[in-house]
Amino acid sequence: MRRANRDYGKYLRGSEEMGSCPGVPHEGPLHPAPSAPAPAPPPAASRFMFLALLGLGLGQVVCSIALFLYFRAQMDPNRISEDSTRCFYRILRLRENTGLQDSTLESEDTEALPDSCRRMKQAFQGAVQRELQHIVGPQRFSGVPAMMEGSWLDVARRGKPEAQPFAHLTINAADIPSGSHKVSLSSWYHDRGWAKISNMTLSNGKLRVNQDGFYYLYANICFRHHETSGSVPADYLQLMVYVVKTSIKIPSSHNLMKGGSTKNWSGNSEFHFYSINVGGFFKLRAGEEISVQVSNPSLLDPDQDATYFGAFKVQDID
């Protein structure tokens, strides 16, 4: 019995030694397999992160300058003048006010600034660049020179959609031609009263298109005469309006719309009035110009709700 127990104990010890032998294969790997590298963030996420940091940097610079001006005014209100404050706001709104102007025209606007405003603009631009370089790092900042080589506020404007082209122009009552012959009206208001223009150009009485597209053009012309103004030029008047398109690339003009009538204003009536309204959709190219011609300009009604014309873009050209 004892001998059997001793033999069984030797058998167990032998099994343990065999299990710890280096030659015996192990179940499972000795070392865990290396994990796969983390996927790189998608380009859209990187671009969003960069734009977020960009906006944060611009906001920090603007807030810093605003705080500086505030505390400077609190310490000595006489040291900061109204001109300095106006200059600061003028710099911030420089690009917004220029609209579609290119870099050459923007440089001319910058040269028109006073020396103090130009120095403030240069300091502000340098502060923006240093702040962006500090946030995104020198290597990544050097990789986006196209953003900084153009306008100094183009970075803030890249995400801003371009303004929809439109114009509403009212006649300049102080510069209406006289006579009864057909003339081109060359003096319009674009920023007075109801007149407004955006993303289009008014030059020498002609409305220039800056974007290709389909536009709705309209014109309203009113003729009037009172007996206190004297006699009319003729018993029968041809009261007409023409909306004309002029191409600059290929010098030519075409009538897009016309309207009017022949009126007899020779009666005993104290007051005569006639209104013409025309409108329509047209495909226009950048650089083309729209103008208005009328007959008997001396009879025009100069009120802003009587004689006007305009245009607005409806859709792009496919």
From Swiss-Prot:
- Does the record bear Transmembrane helix in its keywords? yes
Q: How is it modified after translation?
A: The soluble form derives from the membrane form by proteolytic processing.
- InterPro entries from the xrefs? TNF_dom, TNF_ligand_10/11, Tumour_necrosis_fac-like_dom
Point out the glycosylated residues in this chain: N199, N264
Membrane topology (Cytoplasmic): 1-47
Q: Which residues lie on this side of the membrane: Extracellular?
A: 69-318
GO cellular component annotations of the record: extracellular space; plasma membrane
Q: Where is this region: Disordered?
A: 13-41
Q: Which domain of life does the protein's organism represent?
A: Eukaryota
Kindly state which keywords UniProt assigns to this record, in alphabetical order: Cell membrane, Cytokine, Developmental protein, Differentiation, Glycoprotein, Membrane, Receptor, Secreted, Signal-anchor, Transmembrane, Transmembrane helix
Q: What does this protein do?
A: Cytokine that binds to TNFRSF11B/OPG and to TNFRSF11A/RANK. Osteoclast differentiation and activation factor. Augments the ability of dendritic cells to stimulate naive T-cell proliferation. May be an important regulator of interactions between T-cells and dendritic cells and may play a role in the regulation of the T-cell-dependent immune response. May also play an important role in enhanced bone-resorption in humoral hypercalcemia of malignancy.
- Mind telling me what this protein is named? Tumor necrosis factor ligand superfamily member 11
Source species of the chain: Rattus norvegicus
Tell me the lineage of the source organism.
Eukaryota, Metazoa, Chordata, Craniata, Vertebrata
Q: What gene is this protein translated from?
A: Tnfsf11
